[in-house]
């Protein structure tokens, strides 16, 4: 995905406010061997790009003053109540250095999973993304979680997921976290419990 930016020479609160008033968003690109560079981007283009999942989890081609660099979106700041992007940070990436990125999970075959179709359960997304380590060339836009064989009251763990080649997951303590499950709706559980209590009641003498 290509992102066009321009060099920014003036910085400070006042300069940033004037920049935003002109339809631009201030930003910075840092990392690698080069010095950090102050940049500005078209606000509307950035606003629409931020709505795309791939913009947050893929290697971007960031063009500044006609020269392209590979970069990752690292952070962005939104206005508390206006639809306004206040600032954006990009990090340069090197083809030979591993990166740590949060990659979204895509849950496949949710409606046809046995636990949903036959067991009338609901799918619970315990995790919505995974932090991974890989080379830039191996970074996936998303990771699939296949629920095709998941029964009612079963849980899918990290070990059940087939990871793309060259990708490892950073788990922060739990080596095999739960990712998703299929369970009975809360109402169905309550009704079943009430039915059991009613069946066990003994008529008064």
UniProtKB/Swiss-Prot annotation:
GO terms for biological process: translation. Part of the 50S ribosomal subunit; part of the 5S rRNA/L5/L18/L25 subcomplex. Contacts the 5S rRNA. Binds to the 5S rRNA independently of L5 and L18. The keyword rRNA-binding applies. It holds the Pfam family Ribosomal_TL5_C. Belongs to the bacterial ribosomal protein bL25 family. CTC subfamily. The keyword RNA-binding applies. Keywords: Ribonucleoprotein, Ribosomal protein, RNA-binding, rRNA-binding. Residues 184-205 are annotated as: Disordered. This is Large ribosomal subunit protein bL25. The gene is rplY. GO terms for cellular component: cytosolic large ribosomal subunit.
């Amino acid at each position: 995905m290509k992102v066009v930016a321009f060099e920014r020479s003036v910085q400070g609160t006042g300069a940033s406010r004037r920049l935003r008033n002109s339809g631009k968003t201030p930003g910075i690109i840092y990392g690698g061997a080069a010095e950090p560079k102050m940049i500005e981007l078209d606000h509307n283009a950035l606003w629409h790009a931020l709505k795309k999942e791939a913009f947050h989890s893929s290697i971007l081609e960031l063009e500044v003053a006609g020269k392209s660099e590979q970069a990752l979106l690292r952070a962005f700041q939104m206005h508390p109540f206006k639809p306004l992007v206040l600032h954006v940070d990009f990090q340069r990436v090197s083809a030979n250095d591993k990166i740590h990125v949060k990659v979204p999970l895509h849950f496949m075959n949710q409606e046809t999973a046995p636990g949903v179709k036959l067991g009338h359960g609901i799918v619970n997304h315990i995790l919505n993304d995974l932090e991974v380590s890989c080379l830039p060339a191996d970074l996936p836009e998303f990771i699939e979680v296949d629920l095709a064989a998941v029964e009612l009251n079963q849980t899918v763990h990290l070990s059940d997921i087939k990871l793309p080649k060259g990708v490892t997951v950073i788990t922060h303590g739990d080596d095999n976290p739960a990712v998703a499950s299929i369970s009975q709706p809360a109402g169905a559980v309550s009704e079943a419990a009430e039915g059991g209590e009613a069946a066990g009641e003994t008529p008064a003498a």
